[in-house]
Amino acid sequence: MSLSDGIGDFLTRIRNAQLAMHRETRVLFSKVNSSILKILKEEGYILNYEKQESDSIPSLVVQLKYYDKSPVINDIARVSKPGCRYYSKCKDISKAYNGLGIFIISTPKGVMTDYNARRLKVGGEVLCRVF
């Protein structure tokens, strides 16, 4: 099985699992997916994640977070797509949903939130937005 957009598949699995009210979901392992999950955990959007290996295929098990029986993640969407990449300079990075959400950006200094990218004055590829 080949994926043309691994990050898009990763985000869709999380979105679908949240809408179906699952406690956890399994996504394919990659360094970028792991970095995004680290940010989501730090920002309080998920409970936890861990790497597991079944049949020599590494994957990440994500424990989803809910508040009053509704998903904490209201919207998670891909911004930069394989067919249309979206790059932003540090001064052009806006706040997601007027500061209520986050953009996750891949920079030369690693994957980080929009707030950290503005603070460190680095730009990069805007991977996704989370609200």
UniProtKB/Swiss-Prot annotation:
Keywords: Ribonucleoprotein, Ribosomal protein, RNA-binding, rRNA-binding. GO terms for biological process: translation. Pfam families: Ribosomal_S8. One of its GO terms (cellular component) is ribosome. One of its GO terms (molecular function) is rRNA binding. One of the primary rRNA binding proteins, it binds directly to 16S rRNA central domain where it helps coordinate assembly of the platform of the 30S subunit. Part of the 30S ribosomal subunit. Contacts proteins S5 and S12. Belongs to the universal ribosomal protein uS8 family. This is Small ribosomal subunit protein uS8. It comes from Wolbachia pipientis subsp. Culex pipiens (strain wPip).
